[in-house]
């Protein structure tokens, strides 16, 4: 299993979660989510 890093950040004054592994990062917020390669 790959290591998963979860970080809480601020996006537009709202809480966001970034979930990263060795291949990509996924950013979640209250309105939408998108993948960062």
Curated annotation (Swiss-Prot):
Modification(s) after translation: Palmitoylated.
Annotated Gene Ontology cellular component terms: host cell plasma membrane; membrane; viral envelope; virion membrane
Cell compartments where the protein resides: Virion membrane; Host cell membrane
Membrane topology field: Single-pass membrane protein
Keyword terms: Fusion of virus membrane with host endosomal membrane, Fusion of virus membrane with host membrane, Glycoprotein, Host cell membrane, Host membrane, Lipoprotein, Membrane, Palmitate, Phosphoprotein, Transmembrane, Transmembrane helix, Viral envelope protein, Viral penetration into host cytoplasm, Virion, Virus entry into host cell
Highest taxon of source: Viruses
Any single GO BP term: fusion of virus membrane with host endosome membrane
Protein purpose: Envelope phosphoglycoprotein which mediates the fusion of viral and host endosomal membranes leading to virus entry into the host cell.
Family stated for the protein in its record: Belongs to the baculoviridae gp64 family.
Protein name: Major envelope glycoprotein
Gene from which this protein is expressed: GP64
